[in-house]
A protein has these predicted regions:
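Conserved NTP-binding catalytic cores of kinases and kinase-like/nucleotidyltransferase enzymes
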Residues: 1-103, 110, 200, 205, ...
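Intrinsically disordered, low-complexity acidic/proline-/asparagine-rich linker or regulatory tail/stalk regions
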Residues: 3-5, 14-15, 311, 321-338
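An alpha-helical support segment within catalytic cores of ATP-dependent transferases
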Residues: 21-41, 147-214, 218, 224-227, ...
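Extended, well-ordered alpha-helical scaffold segments
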Residues: 134-137, 183-195, 305-323
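Activation of the activation-loop gatekeeper triad in protein kinase-fold domains
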Residues: 235-240
Length: 338
């Protein structure tokens, strides 16, 4: 057993918890779809260099009253790593009502129908987050998700909202890749081995979970290309749920580090302690490894082999390796553990 696999047994399984607002959102959004819609052909995916439309089938439609909508159908390929559909729809509903995501119209089974934004809206690109205004708006939107449980961080039992663990997710995906006979690049276990002190200390370093979007990719931001002052909206939500907020900060750093932001500034804007930057940086590296494994796994099991997820996965792994080598606070902490 390697040091990487040995850590897996220390990880706590996901549980289902949440707040009152989300419980009510789950009840409302779970009603059957009864409206009549006319749908176009599904949108094409764009996996390289982003992950646009890769977590489901997206189709535009028009209702009987002329209302334009976007249908997201969750496909089998995402079930291994995505939050449960009912958890995603509950959070999407709450975020839409809060004005930080497109409004959910209807939902049932494996489909979510939300409002279709005007054509000027599109997914953001990484280099656009060099714009300080857009970056701060994006971080504010993510922080707003933390408050969707009515501002209370005390978690009560509720239907639908899943609690996630990034450490657990990494090792589950690693095992699934091995079960599928997927060759793992040496950097996967190399990175996990170097992070062993961080993985061993994850329980002691953990913070109370809050509701999070969970994926810091720029493509999960919708921006109005005609008005840079309009706050962006969040999209995606594939790995949303209750989680350690430093995990989400890490996912944001995984996307932004050395590209568009000062790392400590990101934490402060998210309402987190910048003195604990090394924790977010450790999670940033793990987030890169997770999406590298997801990319490899999707390339193996996708029914449509024309969609190349491997390049995206390898891009994330290269970033993870580079960030592990260049995060000063994380490396200082790791050195102190030796």
């Amino acid at each position: 057993m390697t040091s990487a696999t040995a850590t897996q047994s220390t990880v706590v399984d996901n549980t289902v918890t949440g707040g009152g607002l989300l419980r009510e959102a789950a009840r409302i959004v779970s009603r059957p779809i009864t409206s009549t819609w006319q749908w176009t052909v599904p949108r094409a995916c764009d996996i390289t260099p982003s992950w646009i439309g890769g977590d489901g089938e997206f189709t535009e439609g028009v209702g009987a009253n002329g209302q334009r909508a976007l249908r997201r159908r969750f496909t089998d390929e995402v079930t291994m790593y995505a939050s449960p559909v009912e958890s995603i729809t509950a959070v999407m509903q709450a975020a839409g009502e809060a004005g930080i995501a497109p409004r959910v119209i209807e939902s049932a089974d494996d489909e979510v129908i939300s409002e279709l934004l005007p054509e000027a809206w599109r997914p953001a690109k990484l280099d656009e987050l060099r714009d300080t205004r857009l970056l701060l708006h994006a971080l504010d939107a993510r922080r707003s998700v933390h408050e969707l449980d009515l501002g209370s961080r005390a978690l009560t039992c509720a239907r639908s909202v899943v609690q996630r663990s990034l450490v657990r997710d990494v090792f589950v995906m690693r095992e699934r890749c091995l079960e599928e006979g997927i060759f793992l690049p040496r950097n996967v276990d190399g990175i996990l081995g170097e992070l062993k002190p961080f993985l061993d200390a994850a329980g002691a370093l953990a913070h109370d979970p809050v509701l999070c979007h969970g994926d810091g990719a720029a493509s999960n931001l919708l921006i109005d290309s005609t008005d840079p002052d309009t706050p962006p909206l969040l999209t995606g939500w594939t790995v949303c749920g209750l989680r350690d907020p430093y995990e989400e900060a890490g996912s944001v750093l995984s996307e932004l580090h050395l590209c568009a932001a000062d790392d400590a500034q990101v934490l402060r804007r998210l309402g987190l302690d910048s003195q604990k930057l090394f924790i977010a940086q450790g999670f940033a590296v793990l987030d890169g490894v997770l999406w590298a494994l997801i990319g490899l796994w999707r390339s193996k099991i996708n029914s449509d082999k024309s969609i190349d997820c491997t390049k995206y996965g390898m891009w994330r792994l290269v970033k993870a390796r580079y960030q592990l080598d260049t995060f000063p606070e994380l490396n200082e902490w790791l050195e102190a553990q030796r």
